[in-house]
Amino acid sequence: MEILSGAEMVIRSLINQGIQHIFGYPGGAVLDIYDALKTVGGVEHILVRHEQAATHMADGYARSTGKIGVVLVTSGPGATNAITGIATAYMDSIPMVVISGQVASSLIGYDAFQECDMIGISRPIVKHSFLVKRTEDIPIIFKKAFWLASTGRPGPVVIDLPKDILKKTNKYNFIWPKNIHIRSYNPTTKGHQGQIKKALRILLKAKKPIIYAGGGIISSNSSEELRIFAEKINCPVTTSLMGLGAFPGNHIQSISMLGMHGTYEANMAMHYSDVIFAIGVRFDDRTTNNLKKYCPNATILHVDIDPTSISKTVSADIPIVGDAKQVLKEMIELIKKEKQIHSLKEWWSSIGKWKKIKSLEYNKKSNKIKPQKIIQTLFKLTKGTSYITSDVGQHQMFTALYYQFNKPRRWINSGGLGTMGFGLPAALGVKLALPKATVICVTGDGSIQMNIQELSTARQYNLAVLILNLNNSSLGMVKQWQDMIYSGRHSHSYMDSLPDFVKLVESYGHIGLKVKTNEELEEKLILALKKLSEGNLVFLDIQIDDSEHVYPMQIQGGGMNEMWLRKKEVS
């Protein structure tokens, strides 16, 4: 039995949980932990340049691997700087444990230097939070925190550690618990047998069924089960933004992404379907448009591990609470007993007609560089094998629509909170987790400046990623909305004083390249990928057409079938 200080217990607990990397920034309240990182060893710490970036790095690490991302920050501003990243992970159901320092127990509530109520501030955006009151409780609290973060619907958990709990003079027996029990927490993983059978009967009788898959498929590692199930019933599959890669984008049954900027065929198929089999989704407002007009003839079958997500926005006719992987396995077994399954020939014919609209067409003859062309060229050169992170805005939507994701965990983006500044640190987290992977961050001139300081972190740890900056000298999505909804009044959506990104990147010790014409686009991309393969971080600053908009775009207040397409309204 080991006798350890609180700080040493923290490191030993991380090791026992199999944690190899943590992301953080030191400060007074956590200096004992930082000392233990040296004396105990066994965990690699990545020193970021801002605590928000630490959370995004841990987030990218978690999304690309399915492992838990771990963050270490000090009290006060260190903790509050992490809030945006915690909220980002919470909205997208990403497993994360955030260890925050706190002032000494005797000072809590007295407005001490760098004191803040991290438990209270984070409460709405975490699965759970712990304030450690006794040093000897550290092992069991850590085990509970990691269990909570990774089970049921995953999400972030905060552990707040007062400074006195960590002191070297405060030593206790380190007892690692074999088992834990958390009162009132027992996630349902096995779906109700009767509900599953009922849902399958309805789905097999449908004439216009559609499978709507989301990020829950990726979280539960059930992409293969989804593919097998979809093939057995020959049903079209659409995904949410978070679900891209859950079903192969190159599969004949894929009709791509639905929602505000989803494809014409996906949105039309949803609207005119008679049965929607929704699995691992929460019917976010960006995927439903006007709820009063939502899929008026569809019976809703909703599978989710989180019971609070079912019928929260769209009422489910057949609710199934359970793990997506287990439910799909059960359905696959039940289907084996079916003698005949509908061909859905007429339904596929309708979808084929919607596909002929070619909603993703754009002006390929333009003299200006089109963002669509950049993403398509990137896909061609990488053959779809890369891990792609993005920031938030037009470039995010262009990437989602024009880069074909055929495997899960290859698309890393802030879908729920929509956090600008996410892309670069997330890419660094992915690269740390998967050193041999090709990691590419697609960003814009607005987003990249939110956390551009992490180019320094990349240099310190030799994290080679490719950054594509789609530079239109404006906040593209804001400008698009101003064009389409605010009569073209561009209020504060232009970037008039951008830095010379190439020189800035070079000052951090990386390679910067500029692209101004269509003729040099592919050549520079090939060069950038070559330099990347040689172990360099490469920043490609691409001057794109600043008038380009993302289409399709659903009409506010309309049904799923009402959208703007190639600058004209269709329905």
Swiss-Prot record:
Q: Which residues bind FAD?
A: 153, 261-282, 304-323
Can you quote a single GO CC term?
acetolactate synthase complex
Binding residue positions for Mg(2+) = D445, N472
Q: Which domain of life is it from?
A: Bacteria
Q: Name one GO molecular function term.
A: flavin adenine dinucleotide binding
- Explain how, and how many, cofactor molecules are bound: Binds 1 Mg(2+) ion per subunit. Binds 1 thiamine pyrophosphate per subunit.
Q: EC number(s) on record?
A: 2.2.1.6
Q: Which cofactor(s) are needed, names only?
A: Mg(2+); thiamine diphosphate
Which CDD domains did the record assign? TPP_AHAS, TPP_PYR_POX_like
Task: Give a single Pfam family match.
Answer: TPP_enzyme_C
- One GO term of the biological process aspect: L-valine biosynthetic process
> Which InterPro entries does the record match to this protein?
Acetolactate_synth_lsu, AHAS_TPP, DHS-like_NAD/FAD-binding_dom, THDP-binding, Thiamin_PyroP_enz_cen_dom, Thiamin_PyroP_enz_TPP-bd_dom, TPP-bd_CS, TPP_enz
The ranges of region (Thiamine pyrophosphate binding) come to 394-474
Tell me which UniProt keywords the record has, alphabetically: Amino-acid biosynthesis, Branched-chain amino acid biosynthesis, FAD, Flavoprotein, Magnesium, Metal-binding, Thiamine pyrophosphate, Transferase
Q: Part of which pathway?
A: Amino-acid biosynthesis; L-isoleucine biosynthesis; L-isoleucine from 2-oxobutanoate: step 1/4; Amino-acid biosynthesis; L-valine biosynthesis; L-valine from pyruvate: step 1/4
Where along the chain is thiamine diphosphate bound?
E51
Subunit and interaction comment = Dimer of large and small chains.
What is noted besides the main data?
Contains 1 molecule of FAD per monomer. The role of this cofactor is not clear considering that the reaction does not involve redox chemistry.
Family designation: Belongs to the TPP enzyme family.
Q: What is this protein called?
A: Acetolactate synthase large subunit
